[in-house]
Amino acid sequence: MGTGDEMQNQKFAVVDLETTGNNKNKDSIIQLSIVVVQDLKIIDQYTTFLSDETELTPFIRELTNIDSSMLEDAPKFRDIASRVAGLLDGCIFTAHNVEFDFGFLQSAFKSCGIDYQPNHLLDTVELSKIFLPRLERFQLNEIAQALGLELSNAHRADEDARATAELLIHLLQKMMTLDAETLKHLYHLSKPLKYNLSDVIFSIVAESHTGDAEGLERHGDFYIRRKKGGRRKMEAATVGELYDGYIAHSGRRYRTEQLRLANEIFEALEQKENLALEAYTGVGKTIAFLIAVISFHSLYGQKVLISTSKKILQHQILIEDLAALEAAIGMPIPAVALKGRENYLNLDAFKLLLSLEDNNTEIIQLKMKLLVWLLETDTGDLSEIHLRGPERAYYRTASIQAGEGAGHFFFNRALTEAGHATFTLTNHYFLIDCIDHLPDIDTVIVDEAHQLKRSLEERMKTTFSYQAMKFFIGQVGTPSQERLLANYISHNDATSVYLLEDILKHLNQNIDKMFTAIEARNTSDLLHHIDTGIRHTSTFLGAVRGTRNYQFIYNHMHHYQKMLNALGAAIRQNRYVLEGNRNLQKIKVHVQQEDMASLRERAGHIKATIMLSGTLEVNGGFSHLDYWYGDRPFKSLIVQNENLFGGTKIFIPEDIPAYDINDDDFIAAIVEYIAVYLSETGQKLMVLFSNFELLDKVHEYTADVQTFEDFVILRQTRMSSSEKLLSQFNHLDRCVLLGTSSFNEGINMQASGTKCLMLTKLPFPVPKKSDFRNFYKNDLPEAVFQFRQIAGRVQRRPEDRGLLLLFDKRILDRKYRNTFLKYFPSENVIQGDGESFKGLLRDL
């Protein structure tokens, strides 16, 4: 590859394998498929089962839908090795996670005496991370769903290979639409990457298969998508007029309670009143408050700040609900999403990233991903590209090094747009930031308000960890590394390098000493080491200040000094919480930067806050909302549906011991109930635990129960991705997911028929007498919100049917029983033994 019309004629062999495991030296290939792509078309496909190994584990059978009978008459790999080698000859070997498929196939060839060495390797995972920058996950089925590619039977080699081939074609076509300047930049960046992406880009540029720069504006060495402007003034409209238009256009059912909600919210906006409003799930509160806000703006020209809890809800409001209302009134409704400034790409930080030479794969991919994303984004909101782990750390480091310059292009543009919008939308975490930046707005609507307190507490918290601080100092580097120190030395006299290196060595040792003191809970030693670190950093800053090209390294180390000062102040004022105590490298120090009183003071100019939720009232009242309202009066309103969870039954076993993770009988009882469910229904099941210790013990017990041999056990560990586990759970038919509180909310359980979820404990600790008032003010409301969210996993719609098994009798014999169960019909709350549970399952 590289010149002439090679790209036009080049063949790609897209390979996918299904195997009995992940070890290429021990496990076997059970299905192989090769799809040949040429000239952006699929021209051939070869697929076969293989019989080198026919005994399959339950997990492999469930994952692939391949059973032993399909393999019995299939060839062995040695029988087809020559044919496969011929198919691959002269092609670019391509796969989704190419290291896995290439490694397995190369090992299989080797066992047949064939030395397979392709000239080029291409990984569609790597390509997707760069050229599909908005994707959050890169499993093939997730990408296929996002792009609308057909993949009805994931984890079968024939369908996976074809979907990967279609993905490759999509990626190549997208690369060809990029302007030549960007592609040349991507080509130079990609050279150090492990696989042969640079050759593909070179061929595209050489053959002039590129787009133009129309609709783009240049910023230094890169382009940004030019955003189209234009505003129209809204015509005045009452709540009733907007609601009638919405119903007529959408064809939705007219609901008196929904219109009542809209009018109540409009009145609170108009009168500048505080309002706490609980409205049951399904009443349509989002459309109700949007109609109230739009009418309020059209009549009075005043803007409203709306806050909600999750990205998916923000997307629903801005893309789906707003579009329905725009169609109803026949004109666009200006709205803008806004967050804190640090959540938008800092162009100065990006320029710095591009200027630094670094062959680290993650940094290269980050640079390339950002170059592509800037041609697409209208907002510059970093959440669009889901920076995680090293990517996030590298960008944050560059942002610190860039300092407070003029690079906040996207944030400033969002602020300008907010000044002309009907409403500004944010999420709870950034609510206070938006209140700070929008002093003209004095009215706030908080949707999903039961989540607000937790989000604000998270926002007020800064976390210090051993690994993060080591990484931060490591970014300064050594003279031989292409990082900050080497860049500084290249512009200055090298005589000072020994002093700087010595200081960095001491700072690294200082981090070890700080976290050793934290591990030992020795506050005096910790403060001594913090002060020592501050002095070392001051010496470093003094040594570089005023020299040539010192600003980047100075900004970086000055930020580190501020980190140490903040940590020291928190330790002295006892504003911290420690997490972890066994492993030095996993210890975290959570520091509270502000309290709720200071947040209320920052929001002092807000005249009216309307809090909305499906789960807001607790124990007949709203007193727990005083963390936000303080001593200001507020109205309250409940629009309830006594049969909200009418399709969900709650079963509480009466024949199990009290909750005790050290009681073998209690653990055995949980396992027995799980086994009964599996044997009676044959359906998938999710079991949620309050801690990993109990989860691990239950998992250990399942190994001795025969029922579990026919089911895949998905077990969450401290290192597991809950998203990946949920994806596997939704894909499999016969499986059990053992998880923790990370699955309590925001998940979509996919199951045919009745959904079942088992909960080992109500989501709060046993109340302590010494903390009784705090229990009713904080712990109980939070537990009720969590419990209703969990119930909402098994019944998302009125027609759904669900079963919630709760191994916690407190829900029946404590004063707070009705607080948890008020939306469940009494006949749906069942207490019984194992036999009655079997009867319940048979009647589902």
Regions found by a protein language model. Give the residues of each.
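Signature of the SF2 helicase/ATPase Hel1-core->accessory helical subdomain module
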Residues: 315, 323, 400-423, 427-538, ...
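Acidic two-metal-ion nuclease catalytic site recognized across multiple nuclease folds
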Residues: 2-7, 170-241
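Conserved RecA-like P-loop NTPase helicase motor core
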Residues: 654-665, 717-813
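Walker A/P-loop
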Residues: 271-292
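Conserved non-catalytic scaffold segment of RNase H-like nuclease domains
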Residues: 2-120, 133-155
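A contiguous, basic/glycine-rich beta-loop/short-helix subdomain that forms a polymer-engagement track
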Residues: 399-424, 434, 539-666, 715-717, ...
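A substrate-engagement module of RecA-like helicase motors
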Residues: 240-244, 302-303, 307-422
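Conserved pre-motif I regulatory segment
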Residues: 231-276
